[in-house]
């Protein structure tokens, strides 16, 4: 198929369209012929999507009418005809919009002819899986070039050709399919967050909107977000579910401004069924991004579309974030994801070992869980090191092998979490002196922090009760035992003590 035929059809389309539409959407297209295939390049994803939805059907019709009477082979790509070969898009099916355009083209015909184009059978798009936890770059999200994949042609009397479009870029999910509710280990620390995420996944638009998950790194916020997205796609494969990091939203907006395509940017992000944005704290002090996200957020909620956000802190505590955004984040449900307790850490290790088809003795899992307390990511990293060490050495996993494979990490943990460090941290937190913790003073303002420090020492170090007592002014081990039991009781009944303990635990282990 010749470029001249394309130019001829474009001139015919020019007569049909208002000048502004033609100059905005058709004029920027570049074309090159390769054998019987015609490759059409759009400057960015938004132009590609718009041409795909609004003009592709008519262009195909004109090409068929003015060509050989056979439906043309057409590729719609992002890039330039002078650029290097585009990267391959993984298993990208023809988008539903193309099929709709082709169906509309056929409907315009009075009767079937050899030039008629029948709708192409479209397979449900699989969510695109990025490599493990790696984020796709902002370039990939906005203007990455991709080699289109062929869609299967449906049977029919007319000769069928594949219309190839850079499929799946339109609403690429970027979901990790291994992050599901089944692979998420539930415990006291994440029970509420998991329940809220499931409610949103099972009843989208009727649950909590927005759902805001916050907590430290590596605690499972991203896992839950992906689990919701995967469940939504499982229920409805045609759902437009988009997961991205907040920095990518900013990068897409900047690119849209550079290309004078901000309206298309708005249309893209406001047309999703569910928008999942990670690490919203990166919007801080980015006024233009906050302004655009504010309007996108409002449009999605007004349209009944689901929004899920995560952050490393409570939304009200994010400095540099506009108050109107903080206020709107509170419209739905805000849930904290806490560091996993010992039992949950053991369960996570056992589940990960089972997934890796590795036998992990319970005492070995308990040993690792006792010493790696900060977050799930570090816990999994430690387990991978142990498994690798076991494999390379040809030995079963034992506590001795764990000590060998994690000796540097364990040494660092022991150095960081010492009784001296705990005493100093607790004293600073309660604004008292370390000497007060070691003294015989029994006033509540000193006794309660001392009990908290003893309980933390019992949980975070390997010292015995008598050793801990000695380091707290020569106290008896029964005093330490009483302090630990008292703090455990207060954590259940006293919200202030519970919050203090969590804050101190987080400070000491991160």
From Swiss-Prot:
Q: Where is this region: Domain III, AAA+ region?
A: 174-390
Q: Keywords in UniProt for this one?
A: ATP-binding, Cytoplasm, DNA replication, DNA-binding, Lipid-binding, Nucleotide-binding
Give me any GO biological process, just one. Answer: DNA replication initiation
Tell whether Amino-acid biosynthesis is among the UniProt keywords: no
Where is the protein situated, by its record's location annotation? Cytoplasm
Residue segments, region Disordered: 140-160
NCBIfam families for the chain: DnaA (TIGR00362)
Q: What is this protein called?
A: Chromosomal replication initiator protein DnaA
Gene source species? Pseudomonas putida (strain GB-1)
Tell me the lineage of the source organism: Bacteria, Pseudomonadati, Pseudomonadota, Gammaproteobacteria, Pseudomonadales
């Amino acid at each position: 198929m010749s470029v001249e035929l394309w130019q001829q059809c474009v001139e015919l389309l020019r007569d049909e369209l208002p000048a502004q539409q033609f100059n905005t959407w058709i004029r920027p297209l570049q074309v090159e012929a390769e054998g019987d295939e015609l490759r059409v390049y759009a400057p960015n994803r938004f132009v590609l999507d718009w041409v795909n939805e609004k003009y592709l059907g008519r262009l195909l019709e004109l090409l068929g009418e003015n060509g050989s009477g056979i439906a043309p082979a057409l590729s719609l790509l992002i890039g330039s005809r002078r650029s290097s070969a585009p990267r391959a898009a993984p298993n990208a099916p023809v988008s539903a919009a193309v099929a709709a355009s082709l169906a509309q083209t056929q409907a315009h015909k009075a009767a079937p002819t050899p030039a008629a184009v029948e709708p192409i059978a479209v397979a449900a798009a699989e969510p695109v899986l990025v490599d493990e936890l790696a984020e796709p770059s902002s370039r990939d999200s906005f203007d990455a070039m991709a080699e289109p994949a062929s869609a299967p042609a449906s049977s029919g009397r007319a000769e069928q050709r594949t219309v190839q479009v850079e499929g799946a870029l339109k609403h690429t999910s970027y979901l990790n399919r291994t992050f599901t509710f089944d692979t998420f280990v539930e415990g006291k620390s994440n029970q509420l967050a998991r329940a809220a995420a499931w409610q949103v996944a099972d009843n989208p638009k009727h649950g909590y909107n927005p759902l805001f998950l916050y907590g430290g790194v590596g605690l499972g916020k991203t896992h839950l977000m992906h689990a919701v997205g995967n469940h939504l796609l499982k229920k409805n494969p045609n759902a437009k579910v988009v997961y991205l990091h907040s920095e990518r939203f900013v990068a897409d907006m900047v690119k849209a401004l550079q290309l004078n395509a901000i309206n298309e940017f708005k249309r893209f992000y406001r047309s999703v069924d569910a928008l999942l944005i990670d690490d919203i704290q990166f919007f801080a002090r980015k006024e233009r991004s906050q302004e655009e996200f504010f309007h996108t957020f409002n449009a999605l909620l007004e349209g009944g579309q689901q929004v899920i956000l995560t952050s490393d802190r409570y939304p009200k505590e994010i400095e540099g974030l506009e108050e109107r955004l903080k206020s709107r984040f509170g419209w739905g449900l805000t849930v904290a994801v806490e560091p996993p307790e010992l039992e949950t850490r053991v369960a996570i290790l056992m589940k990960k070992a089972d997934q890796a088809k590795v036998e992990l003795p319970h005492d070995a899992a308990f040993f690792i869980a006792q010493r790696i307390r900060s977050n799930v990511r570090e816990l999994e990293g430690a387990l991978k090191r142990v498994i690798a060490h076991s494999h390379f050495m040809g030995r079963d996993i034992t506590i001795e092998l764990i000590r060998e494979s994690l000796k540097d990490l364990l040494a660092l943990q022991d150095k960081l979490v010492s009784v001296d460090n705990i005493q100093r941290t607790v004293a600073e937190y309660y604004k008292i002196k370390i000497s007060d913790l070691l003294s015989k003073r029994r006033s509540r303002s000193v006794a309660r922090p001392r009990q908290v420090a003893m309980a933390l020492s019992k949980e975070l170090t390997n010292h015995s009760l008598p050793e801990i007592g000695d380091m707290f002014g020569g106290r008896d081990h029964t005093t330490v035992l009483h302090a630990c039991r008292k703090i455990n009781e207060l954590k259940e009944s006293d919200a202030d003590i519970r919050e203090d303990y969590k804050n101190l635990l987080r400070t000491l282990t991160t």
